[in-house]
From Swiss-Prot:
Taxonomic source organism: Pyrococcus abyssi (strain GE5 / Orsay)
Keyword Ligase: yes
Membrane-crossing residue ranges in chain numbering: none
InterPro entries assigned to the protein according to its UniProt record, in alphabetical order: PRibForGlyAmidine_synth_PurL, PurL_linker, PurM-like_C_dom, PurM-like_C_sf, PurM-like_N, PurM-like_N_sf
Name of the protein described by the UniProt record: Phosphoribosylformylglycinamidine synthase subunit PurL
Residues that coordinate or bind ATP: Y35, D471, G508
MF-aspect GO terms: ATP binding; magnesium ion binding; phosphoribosylformylglycinamidine synthase activity
UniProt subunit comment: Monomer. Part of the FGAM synthase complex composed of 1 PurL, 1 PurQ and 2 PurS subunits.
Length: 705
């Protein structure tokens, strides 16, 4: 907490806060809980469209799928904990986002894991990678929620660090919606789930500052302990309780623990709460009221219920062998009061906890973009370098550890542009996530716009009409003027792109202070999106003899590209989004799919058309022959990462009809035993078996597993 903030608290309180009050205020005034550096700017994001039932402000967003089905979606980061203790940090990140979905009254049905690490050549980065994935796998598999997609990226700026973002979607009936706030006094507060221990104490304050060199030893106690078996019981018990209609409000105990959950639940509508901290079931002897109030022990939920309904719900909790305790009540006076064995140990105006002043840090614009000339390298050599990049090869090593088919909804599985989950007999939910810190580092505004555009492309590639977005903004310290400027530019880019597509952000998260020993991470906005697709319309894959076509314009845009990364080129111009072209092409793709004119669609993104075509070959074990002519260098064309582009495959007899819908360029054909790419007479030729071996197995080779 800043000295000026301590002064504001003393003035508003009229006295010095005691030890317990100070600890609670430190938690609630932390960046992680209060969003004090970002709240002003987040208001720029669009939060409403025809599909939105409930936007930002609660634990997750709610989107209308149809009259009888709502989708709940949220996104969270667990960056600091995962950098310090990768297994526990990642696992508890999954647990937290699942409870965010659960406390809206929805059953969690799928997870995504956008995760980022330093180069795999270093042992520490391999250790972080291996144990983050293991933490996600063990927790998700044990609670029975499939991890159906995500991203895995490696970047030099993340050396000895990791960005672990997690997305969860849930499904619910409209009548089961539960809010995270109360609207009347007299309700009892019932704490359900795991006992409270000392793990996670000061977790949110630790997540609101940069890591030191010795963080692994110093901050391990701030990382929570995962217990997926209790979480599974908590999921079933919570849903059964919600279905009784007797739950008046519900919060999970995440960052800030009981202090945050109870004060936010009571304070939103101007009410207060009394907490009897000595009634909280404890895991460890000798805990103090301070520790109880700010512990972030996992797998705990706070229910607000009428006094006469406590026993009925208690029977449900006991059926699942979950501990429960009435730990407080909602009062009319807007105060937050804590008792410990009959003594009042804290008494604060509730708005002092929930109404934290915003901070505007100084900003300094930076310019990194400069036009650079790509070195003269043979197309075939450039292809070999890019195709074997850890950012390009299949992440099968990751998703094979996940049970991505549990619950039986997964129609399109990990590895494609978007996953699809069956919602009913006719429709599915498409879900995807994207981020590109290399673009955002060069140009935060245009990089952010590109992130949204790629989410849209990934959704429409499987035939889905986009419904809504969530965002996770991963940045270094906002106290750095360049970082704060890049954050604001990113938010503006996210806002402008979403408005252009008539999309709304229904939930989100901001994670600042992502740096280790004065080494900041690149600006990394991650956007996840959901869409609605007719199951019968999903393109199933190219057929032998199909024509290959390109939709969209290729420009010389290689700044932040995978080609420049493998060549060690830092400059260049980040790709720009032409919103009109992007929207028009997305609508054209949906039209082509609805009219059954295409057999497959793949968006062109990282690695350009060269990689998009090679992926087509590797995914389906088919030959691909494609030929292009361009006014710029062969490798510039092949590896340009211009937005707004798609590779489509279609039967030859559908080409003319397709041309009436979309501006398509015929570039090749599916068939044969080879992958053959030609640009301006330069050729890349690969045996399918060799191409596929690198794509599917190279990650295992890198990890020496």
């Amino acid at each position: 907490m800043l000295p000026r903030e301590e002064k504001i608290i003393r003035e508003r309180l009229g006295r010095e806060p005691n030890e317990v009050e100070k600890a609670m205020l430190e938690v609630m005034w932390s960046e992680h809980v209060s969003y004090k550096s970002s709240r002003k700017w987040l208001k720029l994001l669009p939060t409403k469209n025809e599909h939105v039932i409930l936007g930002p402000g609660e634990d997750a967003g709610v989107v209308k799928f149809d009259e009888s089905t709502w989708i709940v979606i949220g996104i969270e980061s667990h960056n600091h904990p995962s950098a310090v203790e990768p297994y526990g940090g990642a696992a508890t990140g999954i647990g937290g986002i699942v409870r965010d979905i659960l406390c809206m009254g929805a059953r969690p049905i799928a997870l995504l894991d956008p995760i980022r690490f330093g180069p795999l050549e270093k042992e520490k980065n391999r250790y972080l990678f291996e144990y983050v994935v293991k933490g996600i796998a063990d927790y998700g598999n044990r609670i029975g929620v499939p991890t159906v997609g995500g991203e895995t990226e490696f970047d030099e700026s993340l050396d000895n660090y990791t960005l672990v973002n997690v997305v969860c979607v849930g499904i619910m009936k409209p009548e089961h919606l539960v809010h995270s706030y109360v609207t009347k006094p007299g309700l009892k507060l019932v704490l359900v789930g795991n006992r409270t221990g000392r793990d996670g104490i000061h977790g949110v304050t630790f997540a609101s500052e940069e890591l030191s060199e010795n963080a692994e030893e110093e901050d391990r106690s701030a990382v929570q302990i995962p217990d997926p078996f209790t979480e599974k019981l908590l999921i079933e018990a919570t849903l059964e309780a919600v279905y009784t209609g007797k739950v008046k409000a519900l919060k999970d105990l995440g960052g800030g623990g009981l202090t945050c959950a109870a004060s936010e639940m009571a304070g939103k509508k101007g009410l207060g709460a009394v907490i009897y901290a000595d009634r909280v079931p404890l895991r460890e002897p000798g805990m103090t009221p301070l520790e109880v109030m700010i512990s972030e022990s996992q797998e705990r939920m706070l229910f607000a219920v009428e006094p006469e309904d406590v026993e009925e719900l208690a029977k449900i909790f006991e059926k699942y062998e979950l501990e429960w305790a009435v730990v407080g009540e909602i009062i009319e006076e807007p105060r937050f009061v804590v008792y410990w064995k009959g003594d009042k140990v804290a008494d604060l105006p509730i708005e002092l906890l929930t109404n934290v002043p915003t901070i505007e840090w100084p900003m300094k614009e930076y310019k990194l973009e400069e036009d650079v000339e790509t070195p003269d390298i043979a197309l075939s050599k450039a292809f070999d370098l890019v195709w074997s990049s850890p950012n390009i090869v299949a992440k099968r090593w990751v998703w094979e550890q996940y049970d991505h088919e549990v619950q039986g909804r997964t129609v399109v599985k990990p590895g494609f542009d978007a996953a699809v989950l069956k919602i009913n007999g006719e429709y599915g939910l498409a879900i995807t996530s994207d981020g590109n810190p290399s673009y955002c580092y060069l140009n935060p505004y245009h990089g952010a716009m590109g992130t949204v555009a790629e989410v849209v492309r990934n959704l429409v590639s499987v035939g889905a009409k986009p419904l809504a977005l969530v965002d996770n903004l991963n940045f270094a310290s906002p106290e750095r003027p360049e970082v704060y400027w890049s954050f604001v530019e990113t938010v503006k880019g996210l806002a402008d792109a979403a408005k252009a597509f008539d999309l709304a952000y229904v939930s989100g998260n901001v994670s600042f202070y992502n740096e280790v020993v004065d080494r900041p991470v690149k600006p990394t906005p991650v956007v996840a999106g959901i869409g609605k697709v007719k199951l019968k319309d999903i393109p199933r894959g190219p057929r032998d003899g199909d024509v290959i076509a390109l939709i969209g314009s290729t420009r010389r845009e290689l700044g932040g590209s995978e080609l420049y990364r493998v060549l060690g080129i830092k400059g260049g111009i980040a790709p720009r989004v032409n919103l009109e072209e992007e929207k028009g092409n997305a609508l054209a793709i949906l039209n082509l799919i609805e009219n059954d004119l295409v057999t497959f669609v793949h968006d062109v993104s990282r690695g350009g058309v060269a990689v998009a075509l090679a992926e087509l070959s590797a995914w389906f074990n088919v030959g691909v022959k494609a030929k292009f002519t361009s006014s710029f260098k062969s490798i510039d064309f092949a590896f340009s990462e211009s937005h707004g582009r798609y590779i489509i495959t279609l039967p030859e007899d559908k080409v003319e009809e397709a041309k009436e819908i979309a501006k398509i360029s015929i570039v090749g054909r599916v068939g044969g035993d080879n992958f053959a790419l030609e640009v301006n007479g330069e050729k890349v030729e690969k045996d399918i078996e060799e191409l596929s071996r690198i794509y599917w197995n190279y990650m295992y080779d890198l990890l020496e597993l």
